[in-house]
Amino acid sequence: MKGLFSAAALSLAVGQASAHYIFQQLSINGNQFPVYQYIRKNTNYNSPVTDLTSDDLRCNVGAQGAGTDTVTVKAGDQFTFTLDTPVYHQGPISIYMSKAPGAASDYDGSGGWFKIKDWGPTFNADGTATWDMAGSYTYNIPTCIPDGDYLLRIQSLAIHNPWPAGIPQFYISCAQITVTGGGNGNPGPTALIPGAFKDTDPGYTVNIYTNFHNYTVPGPEVFSCNGGGSNPPPPVSSSTPATTTLVTSTRTTSSTSSASTPASTGGCTVAKWGQCGGNGYTGCTTCAAGSTCSKQNDYYSQCL
């Protein structure tokens, strides 16, 4: 019995590890720093945030400035966010910044956020779309923003389980930075988080498996020091489809005792590997035939 329990626990751990991820390491100009030295450490392991009204959408569950160092960077410096494992779920990657009124370590992110970068889908000539599902993401601090302390936020919006049967997942981390050598730009437009994302946004509700021909990343327009303007959605390729690298993982499952399945909501079902429960979760709770809603932690239950 003990052996069976251990095997079941290992199976769940493998399933969770292969499906979830966290941005945990920051690099500046190629210099990689220790895990969580400059990134606020969350308390929900690598689980996502799904509640659009939660303050956890800012920097993740339990992520605090206290105990996190703040790194000094120059405007224009290159930065990289590295994950514990490559992004596993389809969806856009976005980077935001919010200027702290004082020290970044004391800032709760309740002010305005402006977006500096989106990675959206590439639509190929064969009618498919590919996403940049990488193990790290690199961009540059805008050269024109004012000096001072900022929160630098990266977000993966996973839309692999189409709404409303499924619910999109936000994988988030915030780094604390002090910008020097900047300018007198006025970054914007800005949006509050929570509030920047709505369950009516086409980029939130889209079904990426059916008639998926265009996409707009949720959130405000991307800020540019060259007078603003967003990065437009990638156009449909008229020639050779884009080349992508497929990240594969092996999932192992076995029969196991699972958490009680919550009451069904409206007769909808969640596909295998999708989220079916957890603190703050308001989506569908009934798993598709052949899978069972299993509690991974207080924040996430998954159809296995």
From Swiss-Prot:
SUPFAM superfamilies: Cellulose-binding domain. Has a modular structure: an endo-beta-1,4-glucanase catalytic module at the N-terminus, a linker rich in serines and threonines, and a C-terminal carbohydrate-binding module (CBM). The genes for catalytic modules and CBMs seem to have evolved separately and have been linked by gene fusion. It is an enzyme of class 1 (oxidoreductase). Lytic polysaccharide monooxygenase (LPMO) that depolymerizes crystalline and amorphous polysaccharides via the oxidation of scissile alpha- or beta-(1-4)-glycosidic bonds, yielding C1 and C4 oxidation products. Catalysis by LPMOs requires the reduction of the active-site copper from Cu(II) to Cu(I) by a reducing agent and H(2)O(2) or O(2) as a cosubstrate. Shows endoglucanase activity on tamarind xyloglucan, as well as on beechwood xylan when combined with phosphoric acid swollen cellulose (PASC). This is AA9 family lytic polysaccharide monooxygenase G. Residues 1-19 form the signal peptide. It comes from Thermothielavioides terrestris (strain ATCC 38088 / NRRL 8126). It is found in: Secreted. Disulfide bonds join 59-174, 144-225. Keywords: Carbohydrate metabolism, Cellulose degradation, Copper, Disulfide bond, Glycoprotein, Metal-binding, Monooxygenase, Oxidoreductase, Polysaccharide degradation, Secreted, Signal.
